[in-house]
C-alpha cells in the first residue's frame, strides 16, 4: 500500500478534519508498536513524528533482538524470561528481520570478570531453559580455551579460561520500526513524519483534547483533535509532559548515551558475534559484531544531558572503545583513522531503579548461597515445582544480599513505565526494543478501557502475538527457503541472484512488490537496477523524504556499506529530485545535509583534530 509524501499530505489533511480516538506522539519503535495495534483494533489512529521514523533512538541501538543473557549477571530472571518470550514473538511477527546469530562469550581470569566458567555455564543453562531451547541444536555450548581460539584466533590468549556460545539474534532496528509503521498505515492509521508537537489543546476542565503541532516541511501550524493522546517520544518524554507542567520540571527519564564504531572486517576479523568483558574492571562488557563486510563494536553507557536530537561521538568515547578492542584483539591495532562509520544514540531509561542491567552495572557482591538458592528456585519454577512467588522472593533475597553501590548508568532500569497525568496524557516510556509489542499491548488494554468508559466506544484488542508486521507474512519455521524463493522470483525481473537475495532479505514478503516495479522502472543513471528499485520503493511505500532517510534508515548504506556510498550520493539525489520535483536550491540543501551526516558518522572532525 502506498506510503509516500502524498500519503503524508492526505494524512495531515484528514487528521485536521476529525476527532481521532488516539493520537500518538513519537514514531520510534514504541509509537510504531502502539500504532499497529491501535489501527488493527479499529481505533481511529493518528501518529506524528518530528523527525524521520526511528531517527531519534530506535535506529541507534546495538542492533540485536537479544534474550538478555547479560541480565543474568544481575540475576534478573524475570526480565530474561519476559525478554526471551518476547523475542520469540518478534520472530513470529517479523520473521524477515531477526536472524539467529549465536554469541561467543569468552571468559578471562582477571579482576572484575563478569562470569567464572562455572557461573557462565549455570547462567547459559538457565537462559536456555527460559528460552525453551534446551536439548536442541540451539542450546549453549561450553568451550575450552583452545575451542574459543579456534573460533576467534585473534582474541587475546593471556588469561583466557574458555567461554561459551549461546543463542542470540541480530536485528535491523530501523527496518523493524518502518515495517510496524507501514502495517499501521495499511490498517488505516494516519501517519506523518516531520511534524512536531508544540502544545496541548485543553478543554475547560484542563483535560487534553488534542495537540497543536507544526509541519516542519511547510512551517504550517496544525490542529489535531483526539479523544486520547499518548506520548511515546523516548528521551523526549519529559519535554512533552512539560507542555502542561510549565515551571514544574519533570525528571522521569535519565537518558544514557551509547556509541558504536564500525571498521572494515579485514581490520577486525570476527567470524561470529562476541560479547566480552572490557578488561577494565569496570563491570561492563562490549559487543564485537560482524555485519555485511564490516565489524562494529560497542557500546558505551554514559549519562547524557546534552542536545537530545544530536548526540555526538566524542574523543573519549573513541578512546574507550578502541582501548578495549585493541586489548581484547591485540593484533588489531585500530586507530581512529580505521573507523569508517559510527553512531551515537540515547537510551530512554527510567531513573531511580537499578534492578535491571544493560551493560554490566555495579551490583556489588553476591554470596554463593544466595546464588545457588536463586538458581534452584528458578529451575523448580520452570519445571512447575515451585511458584512464581517463590521466584520473586528469591530475587528479593538476592537484591537485599547485594551491597548496592552508587547508581551506575549501566544499572538504570530498562523496565518500562506507563503513566497517565492529571490532564489525561498517557506516557509510555523506557523498555527495550525487544519488548516493544508487549509494552504497546499493555498500553492499549488501558486505552481501550478508557475509550469505553469515558466515550462509550468499544474495541476489541487484536492478538498482536500473531499479527505480522508489513513484510512479515512468511512462515517463521521456513524463513530461509521462502526468502530464497522470493530471490528466485527477483531474477525473473532481471536482477542478479545476489541483488535479488539482498532485496528479499530486506523487504520480506514485500519483495514481489519491489520486483514488480521493474514494469515501470529502468536502472537510473549511476544506479544499479536493484538500487533504483529500492530507492523508489522507499519513496513511494516507506515515506523516505530525504537522502538521509534512505541511506541511514531504509537501508544500511551509511553504516555498513560505506565503500560504495560515495558513488551513490549524486545519483540518488538526482533521482529523488526528479521524483519530488526539487528545485536546484533544494537539491543543494539536501546534499549538504547528507554530507554533514556522513561527516558526523565518519568522525571527520575528530580525525581532523588528530592531524592538527
UniProtKB/Swiss-Prot annotation:
Biased composition (Basic and acidic residues): 399-408
Gene3D superfamilies per record: Alpha-glycerophosphate oxidase, cap domain, D-Amino Acid Oxidase, subunit A, domain 2, FAD/NAD(P)-binding domain
CC cofactor: FAD
Residues involved in FAD binding: 21-49
Compartmental location: Cytoplasm
NCBIfam families found in the cross-reference section: glycerol3P_ox_1
Protein known as: Alpha-glycerophosphate oxidase
Native source species: Streptococcus pyogenes serotype M6 (strain ATCC BAA-946 / MGAS10394)
Lineage start: Bacteria, Bacillati, Bacillota, Bacilli, Lactobacillales
